[in-house]
Amino acid sequence: GQATDAQTAAFAMGLHITGETPEQVAVLAATMLEFANLVPAIPGISAVVDVVGTGGDGSHSVNISTMAAVVVAACGVTVIKHGNRAFSSSTGSADLLEALGLDLDLSADQVAAVARIAGIAFCFAPNHHPAMRFAAPARTQLGIPSVFNILGPLTNPALANAALVGCAHIPLAPVMARVLASRGVRALVVRGTDGLDEISLSAPTQVWDATSGEVVQIRLDPADFGIIGFRTEHLLGASPERNADLTRKVFGGTDPGADSEVVASIRLAVALNAAAALAAADSVDDPNACSIPLSDRINTHLPR
């Protein structure tokens, strides 16, 4: 807390201008984790998954990663999602969950207990990285993606060992993948060529696959999953309340009414991204899974 907001912003912009390196980001992430309120390990759980994005893609889409996390947990894989309020997007994961009525103010022990019982829990970043409150004003005032956007996905307080990570700023995607690989996290870092920090359904997606421990860059196409002519505008979100309403409709069993087409599109996006997160989790217990083409690994988890 000794740096002024101007100094913090200047530090972030300096890194942004020169280009963040994996070594720099790894040191920043390690320092954050050193001072974090870590979530205790859950006995008997081998894979803990995070489904998270950097935000800042400018799409103002619904919270696909948060909904995908619910699907992953429903498939029997433990999820401990790390997230925050919106800084450079309309609605952050914390904003959505709060609008849905969830209590964000949980201790690290409570997060572990919820994950053990429910199979899914949420780490609200300020509760686990209290020092980051000093960076929040500068980050908000900057209003553009910076190193702070990528530090969140790299500093899951539960030390998740598998992840699907969306990265809106393409130069930072390989940096994130290398940092995660160096820590042994089986991760897929993704960025749609349309700018989405998700696996896109309307354009090819660049993937930095770190599930083998090495980083391999590949490309996924919507046609790989039988998706043609998808309309991205159906993924547009708005306020936390609107996104919460759409989330209820995505998981509800009732007729979504006027939102039927939108909800169907969101469900498809959620299913695809959840399948990718499950593919990342597969490699925790089965390293040989990485020898299978990624599109095939994802397809095995898609409903037919």
Regions found by a protein language model. Give the residues of each.
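Residue-level signature of catalytic and energy-coupling elements of molecular machines
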Residues: 11, 56, 97, 152
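Short beta-strand segments at enzyme active-site cores
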Residues: 7-10, 79-82, 189-190
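N-terminal glycine-rich anion-binding loops that anchor highly charged ligand groups
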Residues: 1-26, 33-43, 269, 275
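Glycine-rich anion-binding loops and their surrounding alpha/beta cores
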Residues: 34-37, 61, 76, 98-105, ...
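Active-site cofactor/substrate anionic-group-binding motifs, chiefly glycine-
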Residues: 19-83
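Short glycine/serine/threonine-rich phosphate/pyrophosphate-binding segments
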Residues: 57-69, 82, 88-91, 132, ...
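Active-site-proximal loop->helix
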Residues: 86-102
